[in-house]
Amino acid sequence: MSPIRLETEDHSRDANFNKVLHGKSGQEQSSFLAMLKKDPAAHKAALDEYYRHWDNKPAAKETEKDREERKAQYATLTRHYYDLATDLYENGWCQSFHFCRFGIREPFLQAIARHEMYLAHRMGLREGMKVLDVGCGVGGPAREIARFSGANITGLNNNDYQIGRANAAAQRVGLDKQLTFVKGDFMQMSFPANSFDAVYAIEATVHAPSLEGVYSQIFRVLKPGGTFGVYEWVMTENYDNDNQHHREVRLGIEQGDGISNMCKASVAIDAIKAAGFELLDHEDLAERDDPIPWYYPLAGELKYASSAWDWFTVLRMSHLGRFAVHNLIRGLETFRLAPAGTQKTADSLGVAADCLVAGGREKLFTPMFMMIARKPKA
């Protein structure tokens, strides 16, 4: 593994910025109302810092230097991305920021929960185990897996706002004694070696500048004999970086989802082995013969919606729904009810949605490359 320059952590700086930008909106149950309660100047600072990595850098002109600069700023890039996008995610999707497989007439939220529980089942999570959730978001998967398995889960996150929302949600549902959420960079974890019985990551380690780097940290904090399970975002082996269309799909996903550099599935396999793990199983779950594609909500395919709530969710993801949201947010910005730049972030998420659908349909990308691995006992 070539050396990766890690960003210096400054938790005090991040906490102060979070307090200015978000105020008490982390306690707000409504993500829509939370979106309106931001400090305009701090929001602009986050917006400018994030988009300086992407503006005027299309796929046709992207250089290796551009990618290396994003990797060097991986933690800041991801942290500010979620400062900008978290409320939009919660409002348009749910509190579990990931995709899933769907069965016929299976409700959206049920499918999301099943996807989480499937990973927990494959890992053998049990009552009383001490488990780490790497890149826990606002805690949706941790809450579901805690209920399902009875495990005690620690969520690791480098975004203070998401930690605040995760803590608030855990308290509302009475899981605050079973769940703990802590601040940290998953490339330089502060936990002692051999701390956890199991570790999982659900569509989160894609934000790492090096998969081998983050997997090595996971290996260090996992107890000997412990299991690591991951759903990884990767480009498939069909991806050709010399193909401009392929690069446009990748770059659209990266920009719209706060990713410094996405790699191929084969790189992920090599990385988990290089970190020291015994790879027990790996599979692209998107390649299973499912009757409904994983990307159907993003594609706005209403024919697959199984309930009124699902229909509304999918409608919001459709081009018509996104057009309506675009104009709603533009109106809110015009009347200074939402901070300037909210529309830009929402539009960027829309571009990412189109690229995710294209990547899925053309078999260039998968959000569910599952790997189950074990740390040797000796």
Predicted regions, residues:
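Class I SAM-dependent methyltransferase "Motif I" SAM/SAH-binding loop
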Residues: 135-139
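Class I SAM-dependent transferase core
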Residues: 62-70, 76-125
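N-terminal auxiliary segments of SAM/dcSAM-dependent transferases
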Residues: 3-88
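A short glycine-rich, Lys/Arg-flanked "PGG" loop and its adjoining helix->strand segment in the class I
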Residues: 212-227
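A short acidic, Gly/Pro-enriched loop at the edge of an enzyme's catalytic core
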Residues: 187-199
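A short SAM/SAH-binding and catalytic strip from SAM-dependent methyltransferases
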Residues: 197-210
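Substrate-binding/catalytic lobe of Class I Rossmann-like enzymes that use SAM or dcSAM, i.e.
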Residues: 241-368, 374-377
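Class I SAM-dependent methyltransferase SAM/SAH-binding core
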Residues: 130-132, 142-188
